């Protein structure tokens, strides 16, 4: 992000911390402002999976998301498949680390409520805080209903 001159702040924490909820506590931010990145596949799979960024306090509704994306059916990728598709470890999957790799990135629409969001920097133990507008600009993400 330095290369792209995007203002941001990096948070480092113990890599054993796995949940976005725990990260929210450590960063002193509400869980709604901390985004988790989920790998979601069409069912049956076709092409690259979706990277779905959403507030950590929310649970995904695959039927709602499928309708938002114009898909008949979606499924969560397994941890193994998520790591295979992204070459990143679960807990460190980040759209920011996968720029220009052909993934379709979507952000759950409630994240628009916040000026700044925190998300994985692409490695366990590192998160990055940036303006929501910069995240959308960098990733080309579109806002969708997913809950």
For each of these PLM feature ranges, what is it?
Residues 2-147:
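Extended, low-hydrophobicity, polar/charged segments
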């Amino acid at each position: 992000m330095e290369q792209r001159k995007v203002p941001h702040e990096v948070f480092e924490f113990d890599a054993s911390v796995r949940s976005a909820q725990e990260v929210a506590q450590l960063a002193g931010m509400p869980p709604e402002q901390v985004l988790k990145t989920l790998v979601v596949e069409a069912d049956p799979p076709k092409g690259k999976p979706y990277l779905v960024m959403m507030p950590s306090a929310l649970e995904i509704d695959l039927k709602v998301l499928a309708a938002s994306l114009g898909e008949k059916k979606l499924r969560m990728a397994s941890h193994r498949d998520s790591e295979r598709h992204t070459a990143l470890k679960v807990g460190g999957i980040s759209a920011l680390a996968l720029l220009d790799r052909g993934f379709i990135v979507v952000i759950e629409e409630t994240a628009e409520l916040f000026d700044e969001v925190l998300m994985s920097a692409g490695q366990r133990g590192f998160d990055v805080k940036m303006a929501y507008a910069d995240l959308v600009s960098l990733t080309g993400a579109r806002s969708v209903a997913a809950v």
